[in-house]
Amino acid sequence: MTEPVPDLQDKAVRVCASDELVDGGAGVRVPAAEASGDAVVFFVRYDGQPYGYLNRCAHVPMELDWNEGQFFESSGLYLMCATHGAIYEPDTGKCVGGPCRGARLRALTVEERDTPEGRAVFWLPDDALRPA
């Protein structure tokens, strides 16, 4: 994972309430920006932990979700690209099946914290990928 930029580390972005991410369920999309232009990042929960990735397949630079926020295949065990069927481990972003086997999704730094409103998921941006 890319290390958070020190000046942005204190500016963590609240993504959602923790209970909005369910293991193997729908993800949350967030607009982002990188040097090459606009992007989208997404956040999911797997095995009780939140994870975040750039919404771009490692095979062809297209968004993964089937329908907006639908990243898991039917078993809820793998993330799957809707275009060519690449299968990714949700906890590592590693492609374990399909045309880009061995490649990885671009991971984000994610934390879960207690807040006055309840537990929430936060994205800690880095120097290459920031909130839009």
Model-found features: residue ranges?
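A conserved acidic, glycine/proline-rich C-terminal tail/linker
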Residues: 85, 94-96
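Short cysteine clusters
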Residues: 57, 81-84
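C-terminal structural segments of small proteins and small subunits
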Residues: 96-102
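N-terminal pre-ligand scaffold of iron-sulfur
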Residues: 1-75, 89-90, 104-132
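A short acidic, glycine-rich active-site loop
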Residues: 78
